[in-house]
Amino acid sequence: MKERQREKQRTTVSIYGQQYTVAGYDSPEYMKEVAAEIDAKMRELRKVNPYLDTTRLAVLTAVNVMDDLKKLEEYIRYLEQQRLTGDEKNA
């Protein structure tokens, strides 16, 4: 699990050719890693949707990332339920 800082740190990241200053309790390395993943996702989606403007591309990226997150949350709930069911069977 990643280590969180006690104080907010600012760092500059690059996403799709734009520089952004972000602040958070996570390390600058972690924030840059997150930004790099967003950048990669935007570039991946650009290949499939070459005519989207940057704003629409960013929204499409956000929708895709949220979809991934929701599916992972659902899978975690499923695994937790399986673990609980397994614990009941072993009791």
Curated annotation (Swiss-Prot):
Function: Activator of cell division through the inhibition of FtsZ GTPase activity, therefore promoting FtsZ assembly into bundles of protofilaments necessary for the formation of the division Z ring. It is recruited early at mid-cell but it is not essential for cell division.
Keyword annotations: Cell cycle, Cell division, Coiled coil, Cytoplasm, Septation
Organism in which the protein naturally occurs: Halalkalibacterium halodurans (strain ATCC BAA-125 / DSM 18197 / FERM 7344 / JCM 9153 / C-125)
Designated name of the protein: Cell division protein ZapA
A Pfam family it matches: ZapA
Residue stretches spanning the membrane: none
GO cellular component, one term: cell septum
InterPro entries: Bac_CellDiv_Activator, Cell_div_ZapA-like, Cell_div_ZapA-like_sf
The keyword tRNA processing is annotated on this UniProt entry: no
GO biological-process terms attached to the record: division septum assembly; FtsZ-dependent cytokinesis; septin ring assembly
Subcellular location: Cytoplasm
Subunit description: Homodimer. Interacts with FtsZ.
Family membership noted in the UniProt record: Belongs to the ZapA family. Type 2 subfamily.
Gene assigned in the entry: zapA
Superkingdom per UniProt: Bacteria
